Amino acid sequence: MSQTNSAAPAAAQAAPAATAQEAHELLREVVQGRRLSREQASAVFAALGAGELSEVETAALLAALHARGEEPQEVAGAASAFRQAARDFPSVSFPLVDVVGTGGDGVGTINISTGAGLVAASLGVAVAKHGNRAVSSKTGAADVIAELGLPLDVEPATAVELLARDHFTFLFAQAYHPAMRHVAPVRKALATPTIFNVLGPLVNPAHLTFQLMGVWDPGMLDMIAEAMVQLGRE
C-alpha cells in the first residue's frame, strides 16, 4: 500500500509537450532501445495526449517501451504528463483510498479490484475508484461499474457528494483523462500489456491518501515502486 505525499505535486513537474518534430525524434530514440529521462518521457507523452503522434507512431512507442522494459523515470514522466492534462478533481477533508490493479495478465481474468473497493466502502472507507474498460482481460473496472447500473461519467462535485454519503465513487479514466482517447484504439488493437497498464493506477485525479495496487508481473514490482517514489508517494 502506498501513501501519497501531498508535499510533492507530481503533476506540476510535467514537461511541456514536445513539438511534432521533437516527439518523432524521441520516438526514434525509444525504437533504437535508448532510455528516456523523466522530462523526455513527459514531453513525448504530452505530445501523444495532444494528438501529435499517429496511431502507427503511438503503437511503435508503446511496443518499443514494453519490449525493452519501461524504466521508473519513464513511467513517472508519462504519469506526470497525463495528470497535468487531467480534469480537475476537488480536494476533500477526509482520507481517500483507491484499490486498483495493472491488469494485463493476458489470461482473461475478471476484475476484482472494484469488488474489493465496494467491500471497503461498505466498512466506511472512502474509495475513489479510478479505472477503465477491459483491454486484455474479460472485464475492467468500468465494465463492472456499468454492469452494476452505476453511472460511468460522474461530475467531480457529484463524485465528492457520493464519497461523503456512500463512501464510494467511480472516476472513469476516459472522462477524467480526455488525452487518453488518442491511445485507446491502439491499446485495444495491440491487446498486450503496455505502459498504460501501469499508468492507469498512477493517474487517479483524486488526491489519494492511500493506494492499494495489484501488479500482474512480480518482475515489475521494483520498477513500479520506484516510479511511485518519484511521483511523491510513500
Regions found by a protein language model. Name each.
Residues 101-106, 131-137, 176:
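Acidic, glycine-rich active-site loops and adjacent beta-strand->loop/helix elements
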